[in-house]
Structures are given as C-alpha cells and as structure tokens.
C-alpha cells in the first residue's frame, strides 16, 4: 500500500527511469511498520506475535540484502567463476550472515539476472523503515510526518539527500544501525520469547 499511496500523491506524474527505487522500498516497508498500531484491532491477542514476525522479516531483509549484494559483487569481480564455486561462495556468505548455508537458492532470485545490485536496496530500505518504527515508538505523530514527507519524493531525487531532507538517517551509518538494533532489543527483548515486550 505504500507504493499505492505514493502513486496517489504523484497524481499525473508517471514512473520513469528517474525514479528512486530505494525510496520506493521505504514507502512500502515504512507503511508496514506504521500500521503496527492497528494490529490489535485486526489480530487481537495475536497482534504482538505478528508485529514480532514483521520486525524479524525486516531484520531478515537487511541480512539477506547484504548477503546477496556481497555475492553479486564477488561474482561480477570474477565473471569466469565456475558454477560450483558460485554455489560454494553463496553457501559461505549465507553461513556468515544467517548462520546456515544456502547453496543453490541464489538462482531463484531474478534480481541477480535482471537488476544486478538492486537487491541491497531491500536492506537499506529496511534499515530506514526500522528507523521510522523506532521514531514512532518515541513520537508516532512525528514519524507519520516523516513518512508523509518521504512519500512526496520519488522522481529525480538523490537517495541520501532525500533521507536527510525528511529527517531520516543515512542507513549506511553505524549510528543509525546501532540505534535501530537497540530499539529492536529494547522493544522486543530479543533474548526472550516472541511477543514478550518489556513492561
């Protein structure tokens, strides 16, 4: 629905090659986290479990996006790499990032073939969406204003400049990642069970 909201705001403007797809992913993922306040109405007593699952999905997007990008960079640096080496490389990278190897699954990701180096956008946008979620924990109205302002941007804009303009941090900065990680730890008590929030 975040993409739809952005299209609605664009009016007559059509998507073109100048679209910033990195921002478009934040439009989508950001709206997902801002909807958490409605989960209790929709899911009742299961709301905290579903919120937990959504947050873990975003964390997974960060890890997977970085893993696939590292894999792509290595393959593009060595275009003659044999297939068996690619499979082993993918397995090792996944072991490093996720704690388990995925050997052949990379062939199912069409981005590797159709839009190389785009997959990392899911990671950077997830960091920004998680920052928006952390902002909403402190001040939901402010987070909504940031999101609303962000959705005004799509065509012919610079990624990091736009994030700064709307009040979001550089997702590549360690400060941003540490703040998001701390918010996740504090809110979800990651050492505890899913759905067991701090009192």
Model-flagged regions — what are they?
Residues 3-5, 30, 41-42, 61, ...:
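C-terminal, non-catalytic "cap/extension" segments appended to globular domains
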Residues 13-24, 114, 118:
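Alpha-helix N-cap/helix-initiation motif
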Residues 1-14:
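Catalytic Zn2+-binding segment of zinc metalloproteases
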Residues 13, 20, 42-49, 174-177:
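Short, structured coil/loop segments at alpha-helix boundaries
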Residues 18-46, 54-55, 60, 125:
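Post-HExxH zinc-binding segment in Zn-dependent metallohydrolases
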Residues 11-19, 50-57, 76, 109-110:
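Short beta-alpha connecting loops at secondary-structure transitions
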Residues 9, 35, 39, 136:
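Active-site catalytic pocket residues across diverse enzymes, especially alpha/beta-hydrolases
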């Amino acid at each position: 629905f975040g993409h739809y909201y952005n299209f609605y705001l664009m009016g007559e403007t059509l998507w073109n090659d100048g679209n910033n797809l990195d921002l478009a992913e934040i439009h989508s993922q950001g709206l997902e986290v801002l909807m958490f306040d409605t989960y209790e109405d929709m899911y009742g007593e299961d709301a905290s479990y579903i919120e937990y699952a959504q947050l873990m999905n975003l964390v997974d997007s960060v890890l997977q996006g970085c893993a696939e990008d590292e894999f792509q960079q290595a393959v593009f640096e060595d275009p003659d790499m044999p297939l068996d080496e690619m499979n082993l490389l993918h397995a090792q990278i996944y072991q490093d990032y996720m704690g388990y190897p995925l050997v052949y699954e990379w062939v199912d990701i069409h981005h590797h073939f159709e839009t190389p180096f785009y997959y990392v956008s899911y990671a950077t946008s997830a960091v920004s969406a998680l920052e928006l979620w952390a902002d909403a924990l402190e001040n939901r109205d402010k987070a909504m204003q940031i999101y609303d302002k962000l959705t005004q941007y799509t065509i012919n804009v610079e990624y990091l400049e736009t994030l700064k303009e709307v009040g979001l941090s550089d997702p590549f900065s360690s400060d941003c990642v540490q703040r998001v990680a701390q918010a996740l730890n504090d809110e979800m008590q990651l050492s505890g069970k899913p759905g067991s929030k701090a009192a």
